[in-house]
């Protein structure tokens, strides 16, 4: 009796499994399963109608690339005591304090410790471009141990990254930048920064966003000892 009931249950399970497989195969052929993934709240008929109306293409990668860049540097405010030179434990080369440059704009009352000109905005954008293109990072391409890069204008790095975009047949969709600093006040120089980035990258100013955030006087940034920047970029294939 037990064996008979067990056999019946096994047959029922196999039959149910077969029906589900057949149904799923039909859904795959009709490309319904993918639509169920995107529109799990809709009934099947509604999904089919929506498909016919919008002619959606699922799981289609069109080559769009996104990159993120970051940079941070030590700073000194001129109304505070500072040394003109400082040793970097992570680098055998001696880095020097120089006038801070942000997006090509000189900030005369703030010094930055760096090997090149220390423009964290340009550096972050370069790194975001390199990341989006799957290239090497800025520190590898332009090492701070190389004397050729000492005090170098970071616009040169940015032009190099722009050339890579051109060679790989991409256009810039937009650039989004976040500067985290207690000083200087970004709103006072935002327009000039955007104009400079627009010129170097050869894109419209409307494609660039520059935002400034303080650190609420917390940590080394809040104590005016450092400044950092995040940059995100969207690259679009020219043939899309």
Swiss-Prot record:
It holds the Pfam family YgbB. Its cofactor is a divalent metal cation. Its EC number is 4.6.1.12. GO terms for molecular function: 2-C-methyl-D-erythritol 2,4-cyclodiphosphate synthase activity; metal ion binding. Keywords: Apicoplast, Isoprene biosynthesis, Lyase, Metal-binding, Plastid, Transit peptide. It catalyses: 4-CDP-2-C-methyl-D-erythritol 2-phosphate = 2-C-methyl-D-erythritol 2,4-cyclic diphosphate + CMP. HAMAP family: IspF. In the mevalonate-independent isoprenoid biosynthetic pathway, converts 4-diphosphocytidyl-2C-methyl-D-erythritol 2-phosphate into 2C-methyl-D-erythritol 2,4-cyclodiphosphate and CMP. PANTHER family: 2-C-METHYL-D-ERYTHRITOL 2,4-CYCLODIPHOSPHATE SYNTHASE, CHLOROPLASTIC (PTHR43181:SF1). Belongs to the IspF family. This is 2-C-methyl-D-erythritol 2,4-cyclodiphosphate synthase, apicoplast.
């Amino acid at each position: 009796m037990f064996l008979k009931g067990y056999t019946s249950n096994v047959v029922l399970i196999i039959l149910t499994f077969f029906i589900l497989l057949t149904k799923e195969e039909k859904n795959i052929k009709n490309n319904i399963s993918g639509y169920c993934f995107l529109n799990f709240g809709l009934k099947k008929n509604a999904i089919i109608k929506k498909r016919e109306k919008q002619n959606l293409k699922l799981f289609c990668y069109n080559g769009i690339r996104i990159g993120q860049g970051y940079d941070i540097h030590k700073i000194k405010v001129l109304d505070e005591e500072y040394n003109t030179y400082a040793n970097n434990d992570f680098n055998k080369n001696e880095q020097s304090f120089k006038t801070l440059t942000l997006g090509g704009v000189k900030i005369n009352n703030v010094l930055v410790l760096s090997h090149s000109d220390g423009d964290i905005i340009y550096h972050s954008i370069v790194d975001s471009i390199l990341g989006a293109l799957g290239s090497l990072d800025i520190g590898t391409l332009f090492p701070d141990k190389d004397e050729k890069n000492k005090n170098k204008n970071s616009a040169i790095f940015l032009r190099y990254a722009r050339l890579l975009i051109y060679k790989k047949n991409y256009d810039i969709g937009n650039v989004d930048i976040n500067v985290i600093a207690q000083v200087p006040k970004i709103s006072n120089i935002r327009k000039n920064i955007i104009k400079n980035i627009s010129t170097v990258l050869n894109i419209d100013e409307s494609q660039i966003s520059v935002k400034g955030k303080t650190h609420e006087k917390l940590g080394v940034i809040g104590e005016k000892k450092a400044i950092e920047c995040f940059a995100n970029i969207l690259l679009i294939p020219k043939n899309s």
